[in-house]
Amino acid sequence: MAPISIADIVAALPAEDTWGPVTSADNMLDGVPYAPFSKGDKLGRMADWTADSKDRDRGGRQAYNRNYRDQQVYGAGSSSLFAVQVAEDESTFSVVDNTRTSAKRTFGRGGGTVFRGRAQRGGAGQRGGRAGFQRVGAGRGQGGDRYYDNRGARGNRGRRFGWKDYDKPQRTREPSVNIRPDWSMLEEVDFNRLSKLNLQAPEGEDVDTYGFLYYYDRSYDKAPVKNAERRLQALDRAAYNVTTSQDPVIQELAEKNQATIFATSDILSMLMCAPRSVYSWDIVIVHQGNKIYFDKREGASLDLVTVNENAADAPLEVAESSGKQESINTPSALALEATFINHNFALQTVVEANNAKVDFNHPNPFYNAEEETEPLASKGYKYRRFDLSLESDEEPLNMIVRTEVDALVKNPVNGEDQQLVVKALNEFDSKAQGSGGSLDWRSKLYSQRGAVVATEMKNNSCKLARWTTQAILAKADGMKLGFVSRANPRSAAAHVVLGVAGYKPREFAAQMNLNLGNGWGIVRTIVDRIRALDADEEEDKVTKYILVKDPNRPVLRLYSVPANAFEEDDEAAEEEQEAKGEVEEA
């Protein structure tokens, strides 16, 4: 075989082709356009319109060129095999401000809601920091992008909440009585423990009755004519609200050993409805021998009718409202206004006629015709006894309560007299701070009465619970709730009666989820604690305590006070009243 020459092989190669496999210019594969690709590329998407936007907020032309030009997600790597590379023509280049301006929506002068994190480095749609929800509360002198809480002067960083910061009171209220250094705290009970107590007590029995009653004016039950509402009148009538230990009837019953515990319905209802209360209040407890008296101080807050105490945004004092709140809408001013309304509404809604007057067993025990110049108000006092004994008690434990009723009404079926408790709810300004989102009574009272009453149950839960408890303690047959509004929302001088609604006390208690068994359980627990504290004391020794509701926490505190506590305050109050009387006479 002849030897193979390398020169012959090289000479036999085609001169027009290069070294390697045969090159094909066909870009079709079985009739389908074919593009070269790399096996390392991730396939599966026809196009990608969600390119990475981590640097999207960095403005400028260089950022645009770096992030958005020549982005080929489908193909060989991140470079383009098909784009035509042309020289950049900068002849028509101009700087354009592409900064995104976000228009913040505000409520009034400030206060929108934005969803934004603590750190603002990322772009739109990011997760943000821990505080995912912040409220913008810009005032007149603040920027629109300030956060709600600016107490720490943090600017745009917002407020970092600490341990149990949510449980701290939003506002600081003053206690109803100044805690003195010589008082010693004996017990502290939170409302959660109180709400678990229960004692099923009987309905009670009447011991004696005093006073008289007029009949209720049924014309107030009718819907008033528009723009012709009845004005609330200020009537001069003699009405009394004497504390327990100064009641001559209770003193007589105590001497006869008719009961061991004595109280009035307004004091007892506050204690039974304590878990619903928000404002501070106090009850003086006197233990003398084997008798326990639940008393109140002179000028105590128990005598005032609160307004929107349980509202989520309760009325503010002037110092707390940054000068925007009018003085007539503060809690103290509203309480005085509501007390005035309740006193006069009960007097105005009865028909004062001597021929339609029903006398109780005894006359009014507090009225002295020789000293008083004003006529007596329609009021009936019922002294009722309740048995708080347990099966384990060696001796019965009875309680006498002075209850009150305001008017009578004829039963339309059998014609019998039914006793009523008359109270009034008041509207000050449905658009003002502290209104609790209440509806406009003038336009909604008769078309949406259920919604109006439901709102009042929410905003005045404690007040309505006390009134219902007082009606049940008095064994009243019905309740009349008046709806009284200001004639002018900016003035507390004149009021109009918009309507009256009637309820049965037991049914009304069921509507507002009022459990009287829990209230009796609270009373029995306090009584047992007082008796246990004085178990080793002498029988004739007088010990005095005060039960105080914390103004800022749902807590009751029991203090031991000196036996002569509050007597100086009562004497000073009497001297002040005498001085005022002398000045008026002069």
From Swiss-Prot:
Keyword Nucleotidyltransferase: no
UniProt function note: mRNA cap-binding component of the eukaryotic translation initiation factor 3 (eIF-3) complex, which is involved in protein synthesis of a specialized repertoire of mRNAs and, together with other initiation factors, stimulates binding of mRNA and methionyl-tRNAi to the 40S ribosome. The eIF-3 complex specifically targets and initiates translation of a subset of mRNAs involved in cell proliferation. In the eIF-3 complex, eif3d specifically recognizes and binds the 7-methylguanosine cap of a subset of mRNAs.
Keyword Ubl conjugation in annotation: no
Sequence segments annotated as region (Disordered): 107-154, 566-586
Subcellular location field: Cytoplasm
Name the record gives this protein: Eukaryotic translation initiation factor 3 subunit D
Naturally occurring in which organism (per UniProt): Emericella nidulans (strain FGSC A4 / ATCC 38163 / CBS 112.46 / NRRL 194 / M139) (Aspergillus nidulans)
Biased composition (Acidic residues): 566-577
Notes on the domains: The RNA gate region regulates mRNA cap recognition to prevent promiscuous mRNA-binding before assembly of eif3d into the full eukaryotic translation initiation factor 3 (eIF-3) complex.
Family: Belongs to the eIF-3 subunit D family.
Keywords: Cytoplasm, Initiation factor, Protein biosynthesis, RNA-binding
GO term, biological process aspect, one: cap-dependent translational initiation
Source taxon at top rank: Eukaryota
Taxonomy of the source species: Eukaryota, Fungi, Dikarya, Ascomycota, Pezizomycotina
